């Protein structure tokens, strides 16, 4: 499936360039080599993640490995945290114009999720040189209270 010098960066371009439908696409995880399920392929595409090419073969990432990589990266490469105002001061631009991903699931944050960080005074984290926050799904998942 090697595409040469013009290797597609995402699943949709890969399907188009190879002339296959999304439903027929089969990718393995770059970390564990397990074949991705349809749900994992869909999540990978919706999170706007890039394919990894090794020896001319494209790879994605399964849900389990994405979660584990997010945790490992946060623990190993966390640099510092700022409130939104601090991030905007450091970068000299609004967070609404910046690409900020969820540190757990890697989905790009939309305006409402960025606004929530500002309004609820939640910090953004500099991890591996990139600003990361928490998407609405992971925010809810991380703040659910277990009844006693």
UniProtKB/Swiss-Prot annotation:
One of its GO terms (molecular function) is DNA binding. Belongs to the papillomaviridae E6 protein family. Keywords: Activator, DNA-binding, Early protein, Host cytoplasm, Host nucleus, Host-virus interaction, Inhibition of host innate immune response by virus, Metal-binding, Modulation of host cell apoptosis by virus, Transcription, Transcription regulation, Viral immunoevasion, Zinc, Zinc-finger. The keyword Transcription applies. This is Protein E6. A zinc finger (unnamed) spans 29-65, 102-138. Disulfide bonds: none annotated. The gene is E6. One of its GO terms (cellular component) is host cell cytoplasm. It comes from the Viruses. Belongs to the low risk human alphapapillomavirus family. The cancer-causing human papillomavirus E6 protein has a unique carboxy terminal PDZ domain containing substrate but low risk E6s do not possess this domain. One of its GO terms (biological process) is symbiont-mediated suppression of host type I interferon-mediated signaling pathway. Plays a major role in the induction and maintenance of cellular transformation. E6 associates with host UBE3A/E6-AP ubiquitin-protein ligase and modulates its activity. Sequesters tumor suppressor TP53 in the host cytoplasm and modulates its activity by interacting with host EP300 that results in the reduction of TP53 acetylation and activation. In turn, apoptosis induced by DNA damage is inhibited. E6 also protects host keratinocytes from apoptosis by mediating the degradation of host BAK1. May also inhibit host immune response. Forms homodimers. Interacts with ubiquitin-protein ligase UBE3A/E6-AP; this interaction stimulates UBE3A ubiquitin activity. Interacts with host TP53 and EP300; this interaction inhibits TP53 activity. It is found in: Host cytoplasm; Host nucleus. It holds the Pfam family E6.
């Amino acid at each position: 499936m090697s595409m040469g010098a013009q290797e597609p960066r995402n699943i949709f371009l890969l399907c188009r360039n190879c002339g296959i439908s999304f439903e027929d696409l089969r990718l393995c995880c770059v970390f564990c080599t397990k074949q991705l399920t349809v749900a994992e392929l869909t999540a990978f595409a919706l999170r706007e993640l890039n394919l990894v090419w090794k020896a001319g073969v494209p790879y994605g990432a399964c849900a389990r490995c994405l979660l584990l990589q997010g945790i490992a990266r946060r623990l190993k490469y966390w640099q510092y945290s700022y409130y939104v105002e601090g991030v905007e001061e450091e970068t000299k631009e609004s967070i609404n114009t910046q690409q900020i991903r969820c540190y757990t699931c890697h989905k790009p944050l939309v305006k409402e999720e960025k606004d929530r960080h500002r309004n609820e005074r939640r910090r953004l984290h500099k991890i591996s040189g990139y600003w990361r926050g928490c998407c609405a799904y992971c925010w809810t998942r991380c703040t659910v209270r277990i009844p006693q």
